């Protein structure tokens, strides 16, 4: 991820954050925030499903641009969800940086060990 990409995510997140107290009749994001957890989370599920379907379409000769558009929708709604739970893209970027260089197997083993330690085991 380039600094420019990170800046784009952070700028978009700032706009989303600014909608938290907004008028739900004037802003789609404000409306999602106003409807609460279930509406935000339902939207994530819908968008994730659309990504899966678009990816399958690409394998069947569909337009890759449709997949890119659906992933953009999912990322946008993930930013809304992060904001809704008082988190930011920086939190996710930090976690990805922490995992960088670890194999998936190593990362999963470390996560399980941390969970056992946190649960007193």
Curated annotation (Swiss-Prot):
Keywords: Amino-acid biosynthesis, ATP-binding, Cytoplasm, Histidine biosynthesis, Hydrolase, Nucleotide-binding. One of its GO terms (biological process) is L-histidine biosynthetic process. Gene3D superfamilies: MazG-like. It is an enzyme of class 3 (hydrolase). One of its GO terms (cellular component) is cytoplasm. The keyword Nucleotide-binding applies. This is Phosphoribosyl-ATP pyrophosphatase. The gene is hisE.
């Amino acid at each position: 991820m380039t600094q420019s990409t990170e800046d784009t995510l952070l700028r978009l997140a700032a706009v989303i954050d600014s909608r938290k107290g907004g008028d739900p009749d004037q802003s789609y994001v404000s409306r999602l925030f106003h409807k609460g957890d279930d509406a935000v989370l339902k939207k994530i599920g819908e968008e994730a499903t659309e990504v899966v379907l678009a990816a399958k379409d690409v394998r069947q000769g569909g337009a890759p641009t449709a997949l890119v558009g659906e992933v953009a929708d999912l990322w946008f709604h993930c930013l809304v969800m992060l904001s809704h739970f008082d988190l930011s893209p920086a939190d996710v970027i930090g976690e990805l940086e922490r995992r960088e260089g670890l194999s998936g197997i190593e990362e999963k083993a470390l996560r399980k060990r941390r969970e056992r330690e946190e649960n007193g085991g």
